[in-house]
Amino acid sequence: MFVDNIRIFARAGKGGNGLVSFRRAKFVPKGGPDGGDGGDGGSVILEVDPHTNDLRSFFYDPKLIATDGVGGQSAKKHGKNGKSVIGKVPPGTIIYRSNASSMAEATWLEREGEGIELEKIADLTEIGTRFTLCQGGLGGKGNWHFRSATNQAPTEAEMGTEGEEGVFFMELRRIADAGLVGYPNAGKSTLLGDISEAKPKVASYPFTTLQPIIGVVEFDSFRRCVVADIPGIIEGAHNNRGLGHEFLRHITRCKVLVFVLDMAGSEGRDPIEDLQNLRTEIKLYSEDLAKQPWFVVANKMDLEGAEENLANFRMRFPKVDIIPISALNGDGISRLRNRLDELVGYKFIR
């Protein structure tokens, strides 16, 4: 199961109350105030974890609850702080705060068609980043703090403050340098397996890829890039047909788009129409995404009719950068890897 968006409830701990207490000891019948401070409530924290691939950990238990701080004690002893809770999220997670005060209210708003207002509060892309989703409440001060020359026996102490809470939406947008875009059965999964260490499911029927898959492409001289393969796009994807939005959002961070076309025209497809339609879907979904650099991978060049279709394709799109390949037998893969290195390759330290 792959989960790339989820609604959760989060609540930080309440601060412990300060204590009203007076020192009582042998030979000290009227000791001064000694009430300690309450402990701070635990916070709810999100941490970007490189080993977390999606948001499935929140699917069956969509809540993060921190513990309350403990009240102050006598002898000026500070109450124990509440324990913070840390939720692991993958790189590329966007956090939204909703206007719903509870999960029940959020469900009601959705069911009644009222709509939920969302405020973007974080875009977590850097590994190791910690983001405080809900701040724990502060512990109250004990009566020891309220002593004065005119009030040596204060009976006042502070209450701990409430911790923050709310309903939040988390959305995963994969982080990749290049995104493979194409129709179902265009050969994207086979291609990703050829150029990287990814092991996507491959079969000769459409929609083999049912979730975004990330592959790391290693080059010479300690260089690499990250490539995302999203499930095949269909007409109307920009309107969320076929869960288009669920898939397209995973390539919004890509620096270059790679349109993978079945140049042999298998299943009666026309490569020229395919490119035009794919470009249209991308533009209708996001003008900014459509402005990103792109090139075409002409796949299935080992099949009958591919050479003739490629010649017609070049005549129709004379300025488009085209790399002919056969993902099945490996022809053209080296040239594709070189192009990716030129466009988005970067140095890394092992």
UniProtKB/Swiss-Prot annotation:
Its cofactor is Mg(2+). Mg(2+) binds at S189, T209. Keywords: Cytoplasm, GTP-binding, Hydrolase, Magnesium, Metal-binding, Nucleotide-binding. It is an enzyme of class 3 (hydrolase). This is GTPase Obg. InterPro entries: G_OBG, GTP-bd, GTP-bd_Obg/CgtA, GTP1_OBG_dom, GTP1_OBG_dom_sf, OBG_GTPase, P-loop_NTPase, Small_GTP-bd. Monomer. Belongs to the TRAFAC class OBG-HflX-like GTPase superfamily. OBG GTPase family. Residues 176-345 form the OBG-type G domain. The keyword Secreted does not apply. It comes from the Bacteria. GO terms for molecular function: GTP binding; GTPase activity; magnesium ion binding. Its main location: cytoplasm. The lineage of its organism: Bacteria, Pseudomonadati, Verrucomicrobiota, Verrucomicrobiia, Verrucomicrobiales.
